[in-house]
Swiss-Prot record:
Protein name: NH(3)-dependent NAD(+) synthetase
Residues annotated to bind ATP: G46, I47, S48, G49, G50, Q51, D52, S53, T160, K189, T211
Domain of life: Bacteria
Taxonomic path: Bacteria, Pseudomonadati, Pseudomonadota, Gammaproteobacteria, Enterobacterales
Pathway: Cofactor biosynthesis; NAD(+) biosynthesis; NAD(+) from deamido-NAD(+) (ammonia route): step 1/1
Gene designation per UniProt: nadE
A GO MF term: glutaminase activity
Length: 274
């Protein structure tokens, strides 16, 4: 079996999907998990205004609304968390995402003071953060805030990790990669777009260039520039289609380099790194 086939199997990607059916799979997955764990009553998710959090947020709110209707109680809630670093460049998109999702609650946590405090504390002991490492600090601070909110609301922190992100390891370890539950994990980027179209999402929220926007030296850096390969090629690869050898090599190199991100902490029993 080729590495491409190994990756497709590991990430559970289908070569084609029925968007309505995949919406139902994700919603039922969230509902079933909460039904199996009655002490959990909320879902918590950071909303950025991009494709992945918009889709995941809509799935979360749908699941919570159905649970309330099915149980006849108001104990379940979806909490959307705004997590800007100061002023968000695409604030209008974030507001549009919130309007589309219609979350039960919206909380806003400005992470800038916490990041600046951490940066100053480290500088005082001679550790000067690079712009890249500071970007990872932002991702981890966002996750820290979400876990605090979830902890006070009997909640799960929901992730937005999907197959096109997982294959490249394009997430921050213990930042946006550190979540409790990932309802869109098996989907690639174009499949996520298909689900949003099915859900009636405003198209500008999933047609704009994806960006993590963590680096101040390179603001709004497109994911595809950082990765050196387009999502179209990544999606083709994940659907089992033949792609240019250089693009395939780029994807597979990212996959190998970031294997540690997709695993629990390494122990003496692990040998994948050898």
């Amino acid at each position: 079996m080729s590495l491409q086939n190994d990756i497709i199997t590991a990430l559970g990607v289908k070569s084609s999907i029925d968007p309505a059916q995949e919406i139902r799979v994700s919603v039922d997955f969230l509902k079933n998990y909460l039904n199996a764990h009655p002490f959990i009553t909320s879902l918590v998710l950071g909303i950025s205004g991009g494709q992945d959090s918009t889709l995941t947020g809509k799935l979360c709110q749908t699941a919570i609304t159905e649970l309330r209707n099915e149980t006849g109680t108001s104990r379940y809630q979806f909490i959307a968390v705004r997590l800007p670093y100061g002023v968000q460049a695409d604030e209008a998109d974030c507001q549009d995402a919130i309007a589309f999702i219609q979350p039960d609650r919206v909380l806003t946590v400005n992470i800038k003071p916490a990041i600046e405090s951490s940066e100053a504390t480290l500088r005082a002991i001679g550790v000067e953060l690079s712009d890249f490492v500071k970007g990872n600090e932002k991702a981890r601070e966002r996750m820290k805030a979400q876990y605090s909110i979830a902890g006070m609301n009997a909640g799960l922190v929901v992730g937005t990790d999907h197959a096109a992100e997982a294959v490249t390891g394009f997430f921050t370890k213990y930042g946006d990669g550190g979540t409790d539950i990932n309802p869109i994990f098996r989907l690639n980027k174009r499949q996520g777009k298909a689900l949003l179209r099915e859900l009636g999402c405003p198209s500008h929220l999933y047609t704009k260039a994806p960006t993590a926007d963590l680096e101040e030296d390179r603001p709004s850096l497109p994911d595809e520039v950082a990765l050196g390969v387009t999502y179209e090629k990544i999606d083709d690869y994940l659907e089992g289609k033949p792609i240019d050898a250089n693009d395939a090599a780029t994807i597979e190199n990212w996959y190998r380099k970031t294997e540690h991100k997709r695993r629990p902490p390494i122990t003496v029993f692990d040998d994948f790194w050898q």
